[in-house]
Structures are given as structure tokens and as C-alpha cells.
Amino acid sequence: MTAKFSFFKKVMYAVTICLCISTSIFSTTYTGNVRDSKSGNPVKGVRVSLGYTNYVATTDENGNFTLSFEDSIRKEQKTFLSEKVDLQFTGGNAVLNFNAAPSAKKIGLFALNGKTVYSQTIVPGEPVVKMPSLSKGIYILKIDHPQNLQTEFSINPVVNGNSPMVVASMSSMQQQIAGGVLSKEPLLFKHDTYYPHSIAMPVSVHSFAISLNPDPRAYIFNEQKIYSYNFTISKDDSLKMERDALLENFVPAQFKFNDSSIGQIGIRYKGSGYSLPLCFDSRGVRSSDWRCKKISFKLKFDKYSGSQRFFSMKRLNLHSLSGDQSKMHDILSYGLFREMGIISPRAAFVKVFINSVFQGLFLAVEEPDSRFAESRWPDDPYGNLYKEKWPVNDSKEYYKEGLATNEKPKDNADVSKMISFYKAINRATESDFVEKVSKFMNFDYFLRYIAVDRAIHNCDGMMTWYYSNKGSGNHNYFFYEETIANGKIWQIPWDMDNTFYRQDPIVDELGAPEWNVRPRTCEPVKIWGDNLAMPTHCDKLIGMTADLLWDEYVKICEQMLATHFSVPHLTSRLDFYKDLIDTIVRKDPYLKDPYNDYNSWLGNVNYLRESIPIMNSTYDSYIHKKAPSNKKNQFCLLIAITS
């Protein structure tokens, strides 16, 4: 009998569950299409990856991608049973009948982003389970059985006219066995213009469409454009900003973006514990040092109006690029980190005017803060964000000092996860280090971060451990701490001007040991002037990562050298930026002296271009000739500088 109203038409599907476990290595291929959620247009250039592994694809001009990889799954050879589940759709509701599947104990329905839609324990004698109404889309249904066995299949309540339909396919069984837990990496979708997206464990769905939500901040970081930033500051406030530069106090300024008036914001000079003291004395008198002629700015859009935002941002940095005579180090470095899948600030060149007077070329750099977290972890934006707090002790105050999450009072912040991270590292042995630490850190991601950091010869980042009478510590990085269950702690790079040297200033020129070389002693070594640094390998997290995961690191580096760090790719990027900023640099009022003018800039750009093939070649030689030492030695837990 045919139903009169198709809306109530029942669609039935029987799924046979064969719990069959076997050892196999097979190839999996995902194909899909990525589109803009608002316009529906295809999105080109989306980075699609299997977690943070080397399996990466990029969408074409039609938004299509194909990602293939070999999947090695260890399984115990055993046939458990064969059962059947009746799956029925009435309207938008799914009804499951487990009458012929007595081993089923619990069901869970999940969206492709990993969120739980529905979960229920199957009560003996009550085999019928009615799930809530489902909207259009693909869902993963997981059924738990005895002996840690689990079946998965996908359901898709596609609406055809008014008639819901279901498409389901079985996946292989998974079981926790000796030697590890069988798991799948999520598919990650990243593009500078959009919020990131992930699909958790799409076991039985190999072809699908994805919609990415545009990120409003991306407009500011369009690398094809050079926008104008004009600040009107009173004479008194200008003098105050100079006088109080070391106090880092904001002063009011009227901000105009291109031809649009934004309103009153806060502005101040920006600099680390080195650059501002270099340029100002305690009275606010500026130094005559050439690097102090043009100083970076920090902008605070909500300083005088708590609700004011600038393209969803509260803060923004304008880097003067004074110490980088090529003007390319920051933008090349941040771009390379992002191309390698690392969560990194976006950046774009801009023109700056103070009271309508041209100040030259600057680089707008995204601020790692709560708004940054919201743009990178849209489903988990409220975690702690720490600046320069390495897991080296169990002091709550130590981690609270580094909190950069603006909305959360530091005194009430829960920093227990970072303390647990430190304890896992401190207590780990060579045999259980990866297992213990991977509960807090994604090692594929960490190795990719190190690969970029070492390739660009970053001599002022997390791999350089400065030493003083207060202890030792690294800097120019952030950690973001996810709040979700089993959430990880992620590194974010910062301050990239001391990069892209032809040789590593600390390792190649001053003789400090590389990160993977175990030193005979962890005594500090002299680097430049009176500055000292601890051998990087002496940090237990870094040292044991080098000792235990070197082969994985080499594979990541080999892929990077052939793609994003290849000579053609980097040279193309450099030439694009050179052409983009040429006329701006030519007019920069601070590039006028004989040793720091337009012609010297051209010379520095050419030097950087000539350095790229040398850096590529030497890095290739390094990873294939410098395997870590096998000599046994004690690791030193470094004591971080706290003030």
C-alpha cells in the first residue's frame, strides 16, 4: 500500500553487522568539494590534511580535492558474530530496532565535526530506539558491543522532495588490543580566509561536500592589498606616548581605515623587553640608534569602547620591520608555518600615517588573544592562552603570569592542565615518553613546528634557551589549551623578524649544538656578547622528541623541502612581495640614509633570494647527516625565567 503523504513515508534499511577482525594494510581515498557557506562558490586553495600527518591535498579551482593514504590497522583475526539492525526513517526521525542484534549495548550518533547528537544505552528487552529528528547531512552511528568491539556506519537523511531517504554503509570493526588503540586522524580543512573545519573519524564516508564559514578578520590580511591606517593623535598624547613608552600605556587616537572612520582607539609603542629599552631611556628620551627611528605600534580597539571591534578583532600589531632590512622575514615565516598546517598569525603589509604624515611600510600582524582563539578553535574558543610558558615546573603562579586570555581573571584561572603536562614530561621514561606526552600534545604537529623553526634559522624562538642568573627560558611562542575532553595543547609562533638568515647565527656561527645533538654537559654556552644559552637538547621535551621521533621528523622535513620550502615556491613568494611593496619602500621616509635606503633594500632582497637555495640545500644535508646521538645521558629540567 502506498502512503498518501510522502512526508510520512517510511524508508526502511537493514544493516547487517559482521564483526570480523583481521590484519590488513589498505589504501583509503577521500574525495570532496569545499564551498563558501554564504555564497556557495567553490573555494580554491584549501589545505586538506589527515590530521597533522604528511597526507595533504589542496582544493582546485572548482573546490575539489582527492586525498589518498595507506592505512595500517592491526586487528585480531576473529569472527565474533553476525547480526542485523533494522533502520527506519519516518519523517525526519530515525528508529532503530535491535531485536536481531542482541549484542548491541549502546549507541551514539555523531555529527561529522565530532559533536555528540544523541547517545543511549540499549535496555534489555527494549530493542527499539527512537532518535531525535535529524536535519540534512551525514551522521556517524556507532554501536558498542562486548569485548571493546564497535561498529560504525553512516546515515544520510537526504530529503528527496519530501521523502527522507537513508544511505548507510558498513565500516570495519575496531578493537583496543595490545600495542595501542586503533584510531583515525580527523580530516582538517584550513584556509586563511575561513574558519578552520574538521571532520572527526569519517570512517565510512569517503565522499562528501564541506562548507566553510568566512572569517571576517581575513579581509584585513589580504596579501594582495596594501591598506592605509591613519591615526590622529593630539600633541599632548604624542608626547605622553614617547615619555611613557617603557610603561606601555595606551593613548587615545582617532583611527581611519582607508576612507572609513573607525572611531577612537588606544595606541602605544610596541616592543619586547629588548627593543623598547633599546630605544627609550627612563625619561622617555629616544635613542639615535637607526632601529629606533621607526617603532612598532600596538592597537587596542576596545580601549575606550568595550564593544568596539575592528573586523571582529580587539587588538592588532603594526610591526615597523626596522630590524629586517629585507622587510620579508615575518611574512615569509608566518606564511610557511601556516602552509605546514601550524596555527599561526596572519599578516599583511600596510601603509601607516600619523596625523596624515606618511610613516612608511608596516606589517599588520594578528594578535594571539581570545579573538584569535575564537578564529582558530571556533568550537572550543575559551581555553587558556599562555605566552612564553614552557612546561618546566608545577607552579600555578608561573603559568598564570603568562595568561594572555583577556576575559579570564588570572587569579581564578585553572592552569592544572599545564601542570599535568609538565608532570607527564618530568615522569616519562624513554619507553613511555611518547605515550604519556601525546595525551597533551600532538607530536605530528610539534614536529612540523620544529621543522619550520629550524629551516628558517629562527634564532629567537622556542628552540633558543637564553640563560641568566634567574634561570633559563625560551620565548616568542604561545600555547593554547583546549578545554574539550582529550583536548591538546598547541604551539603558536610569534615574532619572526630574526629568521631567514643564510646560516643559523647561534648554531652555525657561534657553535652551539643543534636541538637533536645531546651535549656532554648542560652548562650554558656563550653565544653573542655576554649572552649565554642552554643547549636546546637539555630540555627534556625537546631532547626526548629528537631521540625518539627523529625518523618521523626527517619525513616531515623531506616533504617540506620538496614543497613549501622548495626554491621555486619561496622565490615566487619573495618576488610577489617585492613587487607588491616596491613603490611603498621607495617612498618610506625612514629609508633615506646611505646604508639603509631603497637601493640597500633591493640589495637585501637579492641577498635573501640568493640565500634560499643555500638554506634548502644545507637543511637537506643537515637532516640526513645529523642523526641524534645514542649516548646515554641525563636530561636537565630547565628552570624558566619567571620575570
Regions found by a protein language model. Give the residues of each.
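Internal "kinase-insert"/substrate-recognition segments embedded within catalytic cores
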Residues: 292, 296-306, 313, 320-321, ...
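A short, amphipathic beta-strand motif
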Residues: 30-36, 231, 637-639
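Extracellular beta-sheet/turn segments enriched in Thr/Pro/Gly and aliphatic residues
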Residues: 160-169, 198-219
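Short, acidic Ser/Thr/Gly-rich low-complexity loop/linker segments typical of extracellular
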Residues: 54-71, 120-122
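A short, solvent-exposed loop/turn motif at the edges and junctions
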Residues: 50, 146-150, 166-204
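C-terminal tail/sorting-segment detector
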Residues: 74-88, 92-98, 102, 119, ...
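Short, ordered, surface-exposed loop/turn motifs in non-cytosolic proteins
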Residues: 30, 37-52, 60, 71, ...
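Middle-to-C-terminal accessory/interaction subdomains
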Residues: 237, 260, 278, 288, ...
